[in-house]
Structure formats: structure tokens, C-alpha cells
């Protein structure tokens, strides 16, 4: 399995519904095993082995204490494990399929966290895949479940369905028109959470936001996904209206901004992660507005992923100081955009 190589996961390659705005959808199910305290370090490795036995050769097991710090960071940048697992889960592990659209974290905050990712706004497809895996596990192992409270989890906010549905969106139109603050306030008033690209603990940046449900108790899985889908449909509509307004009323200023960012990335020799991310966001907007017919959405995803620190260290084959990282980032970006 080439998970540590510079390639996109399937959910970043394939197209999906509303993928001019929605980058990806994710469903995560948190589960714990009955009669096992969660989590207890002395028991953790045995739990990993017990759960791993449930899965066939379509999944590959990676134990956190058997892979390098760089490899862990690569998995985080590909959204296949959480930053928490990389930093704190000494006895954790992850099961991955070849397409990298299913990630099953073992001994993170819970014994088992099933993640399924899809391109675009396809939450129901991700839910179906996650529930299928969940059912397969439950045929072999017994979950910690309470008739009143539902699935029992290490964090009380996950009790009930144990489901976290999230959607990653690119909202440069709402950011530029300064409507993003009111939109986020409206989202939060409906009981949803807005975070950055790496979820809990990360802040939104470069017009990329992650929207997820907060309530897991008192609603069914289908109701949670339906509610989030309806909210996302409203956000998508507002973002498209904002983009149209920008193109119609501020066309030359918008075009200048987008092409300046393109010129920067095509010609820079030193660039920071934040400066690159902002320019990539501008170019992605330009792609969606038809300014760059030769640049695909897949290429935009390559720019985002392969300009991250761990992938740059992988490219260089060594650790780097801050300046070296900026130089390698500029080189990688130029190569992706075609300036070889």
C-alpha cells in the first residue's frame, strides 16, 4: 500500500455533488467495546489486535508505535488520522483501504472510530459506507451500548449515535463579500460547529471551513445527516450568489487578484504555507469562475496537499529549516502548475 507516497486519496480525485463549493464529506462513528474500560493503556494493544482480526486483506494495519513521526504527519495531512492520534495515541493504530476513503482509527479517544470520506456533498453515501462497516464489526464484537443513552463514548458529546458528520467547504465568495461572519453565526445558532481544515482545535484559514453536527443524542443517524445536508445546501447557494456578485460587479478587480496569485505561484522561489494557501484559494476560485480552463480541481487538491510540511519533508528526503521548507514548497508548486 502506497499511503505514504505523494498521491491523492480517491475522495480528492473523483468528482462529487456541488464540488465547486464542497471539497469533501465525512462520516465518523465512535464506538467502544463492551466490558473494556476506555481507554486503558495496558489493554490497548490487545484491543487493536482483536479489532484488526475482524477486517480482511482489503485493509492494511498501521500501528502508531511502528511508523515514523514523518509517516504519522503524512497520515494527518491526508486526513486519515487525527492530530490527536499522531501526538497522544502511543498504542493507537489505523486500518486503511487501498482507495484511502475509509479510515478506521483504533485507540484514539475511543476504541474504534470509523471514518468514511466522499468527494463533494455526498453525506448519505458516506453514511451508508460507515454503517456497513459498523454492522460488520458488530457481527463479531459487542459494543458498549445503553438502551437509554445509546453508544457509550469517552467524550459525552459523542454519546447517542456516536456520529459526527462533517463537510469541508471553500467559501471565498462569502469571505470576500464579508458575509462569512453572519453565515457562521447562523450555522452555530442551528447547533452546528465551524472549524478549520483539520477539525477540532484548528481554525478556519484561506476560506476553507469544516462544518459538522454538535448533537449526537436524541436524533437518528439519518436525521443528523439530513439536517446538515439542508444547512449545507443553503451555504452552497449563498456562496454561489456571492461569487456571481463578485464576477459581475468587481470583475476586473477579482480577475486581477486571481491572476496575481497565479503569477506568484508560477514564479515564486520562496513561499510560506499561509501565503501559498491564500494564493491557492484565489486560484481555486478562478478555476470555478472559468478563468483557468487548463487547471483541474484535482490539480488544485494536489497543490493543497503536496505543499504541506510533511509532504515537503518527504519530497526533500530530510528535515529542513524554515527557509529550506519555503524553497521546496515553491519548487513543488511550480512543478504542479507546469513550470518544470
Curated annotation (Swiss-Prot):
Please provide the Gene Ontology terms (biological process) for this protein: phosphocreatine biosynthetic process
- Which controlled-vocabulary keywords does the entry list? ATP-binding, Kinase, Nucleotide-binding, Transferase
Give the reaction(s) catalysed: L-arginyl-[protein] + ATP = N(omega)-phospho-L-arginyl-[protein] + ADP + H(+)
Q: Name one GO cellular component term.
A: extracellular space
**Protein function:** Catalyzes the specific phosphorylation of arginine residues in proteins.
Q: Which PANTHER family match?
A: ARGININE KINASE 1-RELATED, ARGININE OR CREATINE KINASE
Identification of the protein by name: Protein-arginine kinase
Organism expressing this protein natively: Listeria welshimeri serovar 6b (strain ATCC 35897 / DSM 20650 / CCUG 15529 / CIP 8149 / NCTC 11857 / SLCC 5334 / V8)
Gene name on record? mcsB
Amino acid at each position: 500500500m502506497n499511503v505514504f507516497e505523494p498521491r491523492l486519496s480517491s475522495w480528492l480525485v473523483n468528482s462529487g455533488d456541488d464540488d465547486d463549493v464542497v471539497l469533501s464529506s465525512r462520516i465518523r462513528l465512535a464506538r467502544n467495546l463492551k466490558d473494556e474500560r476506555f481507554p486503558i493503556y495496558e489493554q490497548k494493544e490487545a484491543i487493536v489486535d482483536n479489532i484488526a482480526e475482524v477486517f480482511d486483506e482489503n485493509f492494511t494495519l498501521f500501528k502508531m508505535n511502528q511508523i515514523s513521526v514523518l509517516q504519522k504527519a503524512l497520515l494527518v495531512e491526508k486526513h486519515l488520522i487525527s492530530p490527536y492520534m499522531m501526538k497522544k495515541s502511543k498504542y493507537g493504530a489505523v486500518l486503511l483501504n487501498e482507495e484511502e476513503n475509509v479510515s478506521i482509527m483504533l485507540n484514539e479517544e475511543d476504541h474504534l472510530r470509523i471514518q468514511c470520506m466522499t468527494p463533494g456533498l455526498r453525506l448519505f453515501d458516506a453514511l451508508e459506507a460507515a454503517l456497513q462497516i459498523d454492522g460488520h464489526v458488530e457481527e463479531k464484537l459487542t459494543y458498549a451500548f445503553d438502551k437509554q443513552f445509546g453508544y457509550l463514548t469517552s467524550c459525552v458529546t459523542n454519546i447517542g449515535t456516536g456520529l459526527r458528520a462533517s463537510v469541508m467547504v471553500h467559501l471565498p465568495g462569502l469571505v470576500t463579500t464579508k458575509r462569512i461572519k453572519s453565515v457562521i453565526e447562523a450555522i452555530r445558532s442551528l447547533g452546528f460547529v465551524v472549524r478549520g481544515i483539520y477539525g477540532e482545535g484548528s481554525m478556519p484559514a484561506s476560506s476553507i471551513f469544516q462544518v459538522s453536527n454538535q448533537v449526537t443524542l436524541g436524533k437518528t443517524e439519518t436525521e443528523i445527516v439530513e439536517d446538515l445536508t439542508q444547512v449545507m445546501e443553503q451555504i452552497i447557494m449563498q456562496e454561489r450568489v456571492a461569487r456571481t456578485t463578485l464576477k459581475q460587479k468587481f470583475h476586473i478587480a477579482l480577475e486581477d487578484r486571481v491572476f496575481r496569485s497565479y503569477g506568484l505561484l508560477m514564479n515564486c522561489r520562496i513561499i510560506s504555507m499561509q501565503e501559498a494557501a491564500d494564493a491557492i484559494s484565489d486560484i481555486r476560485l478562478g478555476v470555478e469562475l472559468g478563468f483557468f480552463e487548463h487547471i483541474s480541481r484535482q490539480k488544485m487538491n494536489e497543490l493543497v496537499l503536496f505543499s504541506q510540511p510533511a509532504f515537503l519533508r518527504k519530497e526533500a528526503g530530510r528535515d529542513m529549516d524554515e527557509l529550506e521548507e519555503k524553497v521546496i514548497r515553491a519548487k513543488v508548486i511550480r512543478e504542479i502548475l507546469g513550470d518544470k
